[in-house]
Design a protein with these regions (language model features):
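N-terminal pro-sequences and low-complexity stem/linker regions of secreted or lumenal proteins
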Residues: 1-709
Length: 709
């Protein structure tokens, strides 16, 4: 299993225009409190905008950065599930930039990648936060040890001076004797890289294992060598500053003298800190570590020391029309060790790859990452003996500030039924947080791209099971269990295991069929094309829409028409409602009648539109049900959304006929692809019933239902 987590893109932003996924043609998109479809977001001035295309080649959009994407603004954009604050929480220069998206013209490799393998359109990031918390979920299953621990929902909550210490998944693999490794060109802990060197060569602090104390990152060779250089050079720097201060004072320039003395004092403090660190981290203390501790460190911080140029840049020169342009690029192979291990058949059972910033797809850097993904795929597929037993997972840590139209499924607060309910025995205390001026479920966060490449996920399919970053851990657990190894990440909460799958529904038998692979990208050509866009005009956004514009707008045209094969999913979901007195009683069930032990639990979002859009969250374990009640006023409108576009709406009024509608699956334990609608008339009068198929074109049916029938 090879996992590459890239940076900061939402699903709609990347793949909303891809054929056959739940993108801009979603027939059951969320409705906002103001009655508009979810696409039409309103800013603080009251102006409403729709999604619009960002032209990567015709503008400099990939050079102008990203959007707010911290705990506060992610929580605010969701707005307790109402989902109507995106433009207010994610501002950028008074433009509706969050609604910008790309299509196949801009991302040809990624679309070809999805067409060749399986793209997942119900994959959410793990938390309503930024990079580091989401990456903590990928490597450890949580953002804290337990519900009593502080929730590390901000990037700065976990850092070199705020280390974590709970057990991580690589440690569990190590204890079970399962090989693993984290590949990067160079770590982020200071090793002397500066400016563009850091952007092209270091791992962009995207390996959060650097911040777990048990991995002892300060023993890293590059960092210790940097300390040695600093300790050797700083005394002269300090002496020069002190001499400069004396000279300035003698010349009567007291302010300059004080500035030099201040700088010298700072350098003395740095020298003292470096010397103290060298006492703790040196060859002698390294040799005193246990073999296990050394192995954890070496595997977590596997860098490209074997390439003599791995810390060097060179200049790429190219022609852009009549202009000759230059751009710094890595001189060495940023995938050197991963390439070498793959070619020699030495890849471990589980590998994580961490890209440098400029290859990470992060909006803070130009979008060079397509080459990096292409190169990883090319490395894996060049060795048939490796490829025939490899699963390559491409995922993204978070959405940055880019809009996605599917509200995430989140955990309800324990003991607060107004926020939702779960099956009995699911404690969500660890899944919610009050931190940094916000109270919110920690996750799930917004949808992000997830593509799984392997011989068993070929063929351009779409998978619509709910996944998050812990799904990658669960995949490894399931795979190892099939090999007789019991490795379980206990940091993953029961709620998260109930609602998020293990990716196994993606895979199907492989019998040697030919696979059409995306054409590998050339590194320099990719860089040239993206770098040249730096000199284009800024992107333009769509205009503000009137009420008439909103009514007539059709966002579906942004998405490619057609369908793609869909992976079968073991969801057997039933949601029914009936009136009891002054309440609407809604039952949500995840049955096991058809799929048995393979049946999935499911999350649901409940929307009460007649009360200004109040939102409740549910989690139903397979084989169980959850029931909730909603007051009935003069009118009621309750909508329940589940995975894969599952939706039930119940709408009426206090004085309407009391007719109960039940929808199930025809065919019993051998479903035939049809639904079965049962009507129960609890009213005192016979009722005329119309059954209207609004999706698949079946003819209108009329029924007369007697009282009590």
């Amino acid at each position: 299993v090879v996992i590459l987590m890239q940076e900061n893109r939402s699903f709609d932003h990347c793949f909303g225009a891809l054929q056959g996924v739940r993108g801009f043609r979603d027939p059951r998109a969320h409705t906002l409190p103001n009655g508009n479809p979810v696409w039409f977001q309103t800013d603080k001035k009251g102006e409403t905008f729709a999604p619009f295309r960002l032209d990567m080649k015709g503008s400099n959009v990939t050079w102008i950065g990203g959007l707010p994407h911290s705990w506060r603004d992610q929580v605010d954009a969701r707005n307790e599930g109402r989902y109507d604050q995106w433009l207010i929480a994610k501002p950028r220069a008074e433009l509706p930039f969050t609604l910008g998206h790309y299509d196949r013209r801009d991302l040809p490799f990624y679309y070809a990648f999805a067409d060749a393998f399986t793209v997942c359109d119900q994959a959410f990031c793990s938390s309503l936060t930024g990079t580091t918390p989401n990456r903590l979920f990928l490597w450890s299953g949580n953002v804290r040890k337990d519900a009593n621990d502080f929730p590390r929902v901000q990037n700065g909550d976990t850092d070199y001076d705020a280390e974590a210490a709970w057990t991580t998944f690589p440690e569990r693999l190590q204890s079970a004797g399962v090989s693993w490794r984290i590949y990067q060109n160079e770590i982020s802990l200071d090793s002397g890289l500066q400016g563009e060197e850091d952007s092209w060569l270091a791992n962009f602090t995207d390996n959060p294992i650097e911040w777990f104390s048990q991995y002892r990152v300060r023993f890293a060779k590059g960092h210790r060598a940097h300390l040695a250089r600093q300790v050797a050079s700083l005394p002269k720097t300090i002496a020069d500053l002190e001499a400069q201060a004396k000279s300035e004072r003698e010349a009567g320039r007291e302010n300059l003298a004080l500035a030099s003395e201040k700088k010298a004092g700072e350098m003395k403090a740095r020298l003292k800190a470096f010397e103290a660190e060298r006492v703790l981290y040196n060859d002698e203390t390294w040799n005193a570590l246990s073999a296990r501790d050394k192995t954890l460190h070496d595997r977590a911080f596997t860098c490209n020391e074997g390439d003599p140029n791995y810390r060097s840049l060179t200049t790429l020169e190219y022609k852009d029309g009549a202009e000759t342009r230059q751009v710094a690029v890595p001189k060495g192979d940023v995938l050197h060790r991963f390439r070498k291990d793959t070619e020699s058949g030495q890849l471990p059972a589980v590998s994580w790859i961490v890209a440098p910033e400029n290859f990470s797809d992060h909006p803070s850097s130009a979008w060079y990452g397509a080459w990096y993904v292409s190169e990883v795929l090319d490395i894996l597929t060049k060795n048939p003996e490796v490829w025939k037993k490899t699963i390559f997972v491409l995922c993204y840590d978070e959405n940055d500030g880019w809009f996605d139209h599917v509200p995430p499924f989140v955990a309800p607060f324990p003991g607060r039924p107004e926020t939702g309910k779960t099956s009995e025995g699911i404690d969500t205390a660890v899944d919610v947080a009050k931190a940094h001026d916000r109270e919110s479920p920690i996750g799930l966060g917004f949808r992000c791209p997830l593509v799984v490449a392997s011989p068993w996920s070929r063929g351009g399919c779409v998978n619509s099971q709910v996944f998050d970053h812990t799904s990658m851990i669960q995949l490894v657990e399931t795979w190892l269990a099939a090999r007789g190894k019991n490795v379980r990440e206990t940091n993953i909460s029961p709620w998260r295991r109930t609602v998020c799958g293990d990716l196994s529904s993606i895979f199907r038998p492989y019998k040697g069929e030919k696979m059409e692979l995306p054409k590998p990208l050339d590194r320099d050509a990719t860089i040239e094309g993206i770098h040249a866009a730096k000199f284009k005009a800024p992107p333009t956004a769509g205009k503000a829409l009137s009420a008439t514009d909103i009514k007539e707008a059709d966002v579906r045209i942004a998405q490619e028409p057609g369908t793609r094969p869909s992976c079968p999913l073991p969801y057997e979901l039933i949601v029914d409602a009936k009136r009891e007195g002054g309440e609407l009683r809604v039952s949500m069930e995840a049955r096991k009648d058809v799929f048995g032990t393979k049946a999935l639990g499911a999350p649901f979002n409940g929307y009460v539109y007649d009360a200004g859009l109040k939102v409740r969250s549910y989690a139903v374990e397979a084989g169980t049900s959850v029931t909730d009640t909603f007051p009935i006023g003069d009118a009621f409108h309750v909508r329940i959304d589940g995975p894969n576009g599952f939706m039930r709406q119940f709408q009426g009024g206090r004085d309407d006929a009391n007719v109960e509608v039940r929808v199930g699956y025809a065919g019993g334990k051998r479903p035939n692809g049809k639904v079965e609608v049962r009507l129960l008339n609890a009213d005192a009068k016979a009722q005329s019933i119309e059954l209207v198929d609004e999706s698949y074109g079946h003819p209108l049916q009329r029924k007369m239902l007697a009282s009590g029938a």
